[in-house]
């Protein structure tokens, strides 16, 4: 029986639930994406929804923006500074301690790095940052409307209105300024100047290599995707990590001293992503006959047939994650051939391009190096600031096909110490 909170578009569709089966589904060239069909006005021909050679070319085009060197530069120049000034803005609550909704706080932290990756200008002020968040939120909900359990029509309508504002107020001014710079460099024959713009941000990258088959809205949709992807999934996952670690430290008080240890926090981050995948399921459509092995059965598909990959179930496959697969354990032992984060980042050619942004060097199994990714950087800073739940509070899940919380208030006991060091 399928769960009640399963998104409507996944109901009644043959389902792949094993870890190996979902990996095979994601890697198969006989299947194409069918997840974002209702939200197509927000995702048409973005890197998330295209397949085959077009996807390969787009991924190669955009990869330099998320290279290791680029991400380390983002972390040094933007992330750490942004984390601290966002923490500094948290207002005192009824008890006199800084208190806020954690999801909103992290979303704000990640909005600036997302805007930098996209190449949006003039979002550093509190007013412009807040306006960007105002237009991003309804677009984000519309982009993943397939997972919503409420009426979809008003969600899409609000998203389209916000998308127009996003184009007019943010993307178009940045596009015009950057296009003028590129045109001037080309007219001057300044090859070095043009090369220096390669990989600096999404808008520059797409304008430098513009494809005449793209419609004029293509840059808006791709920018929207990156803005959402850089913040939504990570902010949700970090709230889950804080919740899971709260329970872990309560059961294992001797491990509270590990709350600032990067290796421990990275394992906790990946275990959280395994248990609370940003995307619970994906939908694929067969373009040619194909068979997918799933546990002890084989699912046979003909062209046009739909099949879903249950990311959440695959990441709980006992044959890969052992006994106690349903519980949070940052010390879980798994085979080297299994991703510690399960199927959370997808796989095959559609593996999440932002995986290294989130997990740093650990995204490729490397445990050495200074780049830890945004997940651990933010999580460790929260614990340095003494994050905890308000007294007698337990977070409640939202009524949604996405695994998220409705509200997530937190209190900080040691904020002054953190901010005094930052100054």
Model-derived segments and spans:
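Conserved cytochrome P450 K-helix E-x-x-R motif and the immediately C-terminal K′/meander segment
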Residues: 1, 258-297
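Cytochrome P450 substrate-recognition site 1
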Residues: 2-70, 134-145
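Conserved cytochrome P450 K-helix/beta-meander segment immediately N-terminal to the heme-binding cysteine loop
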Residues: 30, 310-337, 345
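Cytochrome P450 heme-thiolate monooxygenase catalytic core
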Residues: 74-236
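Cytochrome P450 catalytic-core helices
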Residues: 220-224, 231-257, 354-386
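Residue-level recognition of short, solvent-exposed, well-ordered loop/turn junctions
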Residues: 300-303
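Cytochrome P450 heme-thiolate "Cys pocket" and heme-binding signature region
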Residues: 331-408
């Amino acid at each position: 029986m399928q769960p009640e909170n399963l998104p409507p578009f996944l109901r009644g569709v043959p389902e792949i639930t094993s870890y190996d089966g979902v990996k095979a589904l994601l890697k198969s060239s006989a299947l194409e994406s069918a997840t974002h069909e209702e939200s197509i006005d927000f995702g048409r021909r973005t890197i998330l929804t295209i397949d085959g050679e077009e996807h390969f070319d787009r991924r190669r085009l955009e990869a330099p923006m998320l290279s290791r060197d680029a991400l380390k530069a983002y972390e040094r120049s933007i992330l750490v500074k942004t984390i601290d000034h966002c923490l500094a803005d948290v207002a005192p609550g009824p008890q006199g301690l800084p208190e806020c909704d954690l999801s909103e706080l992290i979303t704000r932290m990640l909005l600036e790095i997302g805007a930098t990756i996209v190449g949006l200008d003039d979002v550093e002020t509190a007013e412009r940052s807040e306006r960007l968040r105002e237009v991003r939120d309804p677009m984000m909900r519309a982009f993943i409307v397939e997972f919503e359990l409420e009426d979809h029509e008003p969600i899409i309508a609000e998203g389209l209105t916000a998308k127009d504002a996003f184009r007019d107020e943010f993307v178009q001014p940045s596009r015009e300024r950057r296009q003028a710079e590129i045109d001037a460099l080309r007219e001057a024959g300044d090859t070095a100047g043009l090369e220096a713009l390669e990989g600096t941000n999404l808008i520059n990258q797409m304008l430098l290599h513009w494809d005449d088959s793209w419609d004029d809205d293509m840059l808006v949709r791709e920018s929207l995707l990156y803005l959402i992807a850089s913040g939504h999934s990570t902010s949700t996952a970090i709230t889950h990590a804080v919740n899971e670690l709260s329970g872990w430290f309560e059961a294992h008080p001797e491990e509270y001293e590990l709350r600032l240890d990067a290796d421990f926090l990275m394992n906790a981050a990946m275990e959280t992503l395994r248990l609370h995948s940003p995307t619970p399921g994906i939908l694929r459509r067969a373009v040619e006959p194909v068979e997918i092995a799933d546990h002890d059965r084989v699912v046979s598909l003909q062209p046009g047939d739909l099949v879903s990959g249950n990311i959440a179930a695959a990441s709980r496959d006992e044959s890969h994650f052992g006994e106690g697969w349903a519980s949070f354990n940052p010390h879980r032992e798994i085979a080297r051939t299994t991703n510690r984060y399960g199927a959370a980042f997808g796989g095959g050619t559609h593996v999440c391009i932002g995986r290294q942004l989130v997990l740093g060097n650990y995204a490729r199994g490397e445990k050495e190096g200074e780049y830890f990714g945004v997940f651990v950087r933010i999580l460790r800073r929260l614990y340095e600031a003494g994050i905890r739940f308000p007294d007698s509070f337990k977070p409640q899940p939202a009524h949604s096909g996405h695994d998220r919380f409705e509200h997530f208030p937190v209190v900080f006991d040691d904020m002054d110490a953190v901010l005094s060091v930052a100054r």
